[in-house]
UniProtKB/Swiss-Prot annotation:
This is Melatonin receptor type 1A. High affinity receptor for melatonin. Likely to mediate the reproductive and circadian actions of melatonin. The activity of this receptor is mediated by pertussis toxin sensitive G proteins that inhibit adenylate cyclase activity. Possibly involved in sleep induction, by melatonin activation of the potassium channel KCNMA1/BK and the dissociation of G-beta and G-gamma subunits, thereby decreasing synaptic transmission. Gene3D superfamilies: Rhodopsin 7-helix transmembrane proteins. The gene is MTNR1A. It comes from Bos taurus (Bovine). Residues 44-64, 129-160, 216-257 are cytoplasmic.
């Protein structure tokens, strides 16, 4: 967060209003994009596991590209109204330009409902249906003429389920605060402790750091790639250390004129 660091050093926003709007816009784009992508992945896992016979038709290469395009177009449409309502402002509590919950009660409620609650309900529905199928397979009550649950599909489902749970836990406090503030901005906004808002804000953005850890713990392919990266970095470091030692040794052995 270079801009946040600059704000901390300067004790305030030192760039133009346009930069502030752009910064808040990009941050909002990433957050809403994450919500919609998690929802899209949940629907994908639901179709793959619960409707596997129709999955290849539903998620052909062309259709998959259309789904990705649709998700990001919806994300763009969802974030643009912030520029019209004027909710992207500098918040000195977090030294960042972000969504201001107290500007418009109706808009804040709409954001929380359509950008968090509704997508989370869709994801919960998809994962509950998948878990029901998993339990059927585990207890062998699933008819033999239905599609079977593949181990790889189950592992991918568990990974994305954990990602969703952590996302919901990390972002729920900030959205709950938004609903509280939107209920009565004039009276409720000052009653929210600053430390609570700051903690919930950074807790939400800390979720992005957790994803890499979750993928590494639950996905073998990620673990292998992490191992390659670590080995490569260690090898490169050892190479530079050995080269530096060799050069230093040659300088010491070189006779002085």
């Amino acid at each position: 967060y270079p801009l946040a660091l600059a704000s901390i050093v300067n004790d305030g926003w030192s760039l133009s209003s346009l930069h502030c709007q752009l910064s808040g816009f990009l941050m909002g784009l990433s957050v809403i994009g994450s919500v919609f992508n998690i929802t899209g992945i949940a629907i994908n896992r639901y179709c793959c596991i619960c409707h596997s016979l129709r999955y290849n038709k539903l998620y052909s290469s062309t259709n998959s590209l259309c789904y990705v395009f649709l998700i990001w177009m919806l994300t763009l449409v969802a974030i643009v109204p912030n520029l019209c309502v004027g909710t992207l402002q500098y918040d000195p509590r977090i030294y960042s330009c972000t969504f201001t919950q107290s500007v418009s009660s109706a808009y804040t409620i709409a954001v929380v409902v359509f950008h968090f609650i509704v997508p989370m309900l869709v994801v919960i529905f998809c994962y509950l249906r998948i878990w029901a199928l998993v339990l059927q397979v585990r207890w062998r009550v699933k008819p033999d003429n239905k599609p079977k649950l593949k181990p790889q599909d189950f592992r991918n489902f568990v990974t994305m389920f954990v990602v969703f749970v952590l996302f919901a836990i990390c972002w729920a406090p900030l959205n709950f605060i938004g609903l509280v503030v939107a209920s009565e901005p004039a009276s409720m906004a000052p009653r929210i402790p600053e430390w609570l808002f700051v903690a919930s804000y950074y807790m939400g953005y800390f979720n992005s750091c957790l994803n890499a850890i979750i993928y590494g713990l639950l996905n073998q392919n990620f673990r292998q790639e992490y191992r390659k990266i670590i080995v490569s970095l260690c090898t490169t470091k050892m190479f530079f250390v050995d080269s530096s030692n060799h050069v230093a040794h040659r300088i010491k052995r070189k006779p002085s004129p």
